[in-house]
């Protein structure tokens, strides 16, 4: 899966999970907490949705380090590549 395909899937999930009104605000640099107003519960639900969509496990330690959309994309691509 390409970087852009992963980004589009992550973006779709972020928009759904965080009820983002303006999809243009979901950029690679967007911070879940600061730019997209996600609280800790939102973040947990987002991680669960990403795990389900991409069929991966994201340990709590890793999830805590994923603070932007791009970090999520990079983590997912690394996990998918490692399991291929």
UniProtKB/Swiss-Prot annotation:
- Which keywords does this Swiss-Prot/TrEMBL entry list? Cytoplasm, Fatty acid biosynthesis, Fatty acid metabolism, Lipid biosynthesis, Lipid metabolism, Phosphopantetheine, Phosphoprotein
Q: Name one GO molecular function term.
A: acyl binding
One GO biological process term: lipid A biosynthetic process
- Cystine bridges: none
All copies of the Carrier domain together span 4-80
Is Lipid biosynthesis set as a keyword in this record?
yes
Name this polypeptide is given: Acyl carrier protein
